[in-house]
């Protein structure tokens, strides 16, 4: 049943390109053991995102990935050949920076999901650590997801793709997109003049630097990585206190202003 449902969703999601967000352009199939924290987030309407397992009960994703009837798969690689240890969960609770789920392109695009039951760690399931410090400009980081590998005329793979990109100075994204504030709680990442980056279906997935989740895929250009345009990622380091407070039981904790 899972195979049929997910295969249909990968077709359906293309008609929802404006509702979901940003697959990996310019990457290659991930090694089956390098994305143990990567979650597939979807619903029966065809909306598709990714998430990041940070412990047995909690998944991080992007606020704009919130959807009704959310399903979360962990330990998945090829949707046509399920792994024996893959698990399906649904949200028990969802937490956002603001009660009305308000977020912008440069602030608070983050969602913390408590699973309905703990996920056992296994060969294909393991958590990713929260950052101990913010990444520095020039850092080489890893992106991954089931997002489109071409844009426009998106095609969606049955396996997650991975690629390496660099942390860029925020001014690069300001120059590319304009109208961004002088400061924001986002990271700018990509490879100038090369078409490598996140795309449709990758939203909510990780930007991994030095083995830690430094960013959450938020948004990028349309078409994806047009003329080598960088992508924008929620800066997880700025939200670590909020994340730890929520997980620790302080469900009224507020995000940084």
Curated annotation (Swiss-Prot):
Compartment list: Secreted
Active site (catalytic residues): 64, 109, 203
EC number: 3.4.21.-
Chief localisation class: secreted
One GO BP: proteolysis
EC class name: hydrolase
The Peptidase S1 domain, residue ranges: 24-248
GO cellular component: extracellular region; secretory granule
Known function: Snake venom serine protease that may act in the hemostasis system of the prey.
Name of the protein in question: Snake venom serine protease rhinocerase 4
Classification of source organism: Eukaryota, Metazoa, Chordata, Craniata, Vertebrata
